[in-house]
Amino acid sequence: MIALIAALCGAAVGGASWYRARAEGPAALLKHLPRSGALILYVDFAALRRAGILGAIQAPAATEDPEYRDFVRRTDFNYGRDLDTALAAFTPAGRFLLLRGRFDWGSLRSYAQSEKGECRNTLCRMQGSTADRQISFFPLQSNLMALAISQDDSAAVRLQESVEGSMPEIPDAPVWFSIPPELLRSGGLPEGVQPFARSLENAESVVLSLAPEGKQVAARMNVRCRTNKDAAELTSELSKATALLRTVIEQEHRAPNPADLSGVLASGAFLSADARVMGYWRIEQAFFDNLLSEARR
């Protein structure tokens, strides 16, 4: 997750001051992102820094992507230090982000132009890693970047306007995802979570959040079902899938490993209330260490 945001920000370079407005929270900013069928991700980097978590899960500079290191050197922008929040919508049409932090717009503009991009007024455009990855961005505020990676080389401009449609529920957590039912039905999730994803295919909404809890991180799931009966059945299915996973681990004569996904999933607990299903998992530091180790290979 951290690597994903870093990669997107490393691909992004910004413009100049456009207009100034009061700081907005995730609910207000979310109105500007496409939400229909979108995977929504929110990360409060400032909160993670204050909690001492970001440094623990951030890759050392020596292991970061060389292109990202070059971007940091030439723009003096480092997400671990300068990015406060990131709100992103991942859709079939592209990736759309609102990034709040401290930006040296002059350096970002120069970087874009040096990479064969162009900047007109406050909007900058540049080619991404492939022909269909056109990057566009501009400052909605001095500390708020609108960024799009899409086939449309001006897609970031759309983020000025509000988008009609339903809003996901926003949990009180520094990291959260709103997962569209379309993604759950697509089979595009990691193999280890497929049994759980299949159980969630008929849910009306699924929100996952991550927040510090002592020396661990708590992952919580909030699912809205169509009926109370659906919620009770989903709770039963998820509990059975978790019990089956624990049985398989035991049959292999091993204990759940907190450093891998199966160990995290095996810690799951579920309950329902009316048409809601709540899930809970414990995530230890070893899991994040393992993720970083895999990312460095």
Describe the role of every protein-language-model region.
Residues 252-297:
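A cross-kingdom marker for long, charged
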Residues 39-41, 97-101, 204-208, 215-223, ...:
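One face of beta-strands
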Residues 109-117, 234-239, 294-295:
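Short amphipathic alpha-helices in soluble, non-transmembrane regions
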Residues 39-43, 97-98, 136-139, 143-149, ...:
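Short hydrophobic-aromatic micro-motifs
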Residues 17-118, 212-214:
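Long, low-complexity, Ser/Thr/Gly/Pro-rich intrinsically disordered segments that act as flexible linkers
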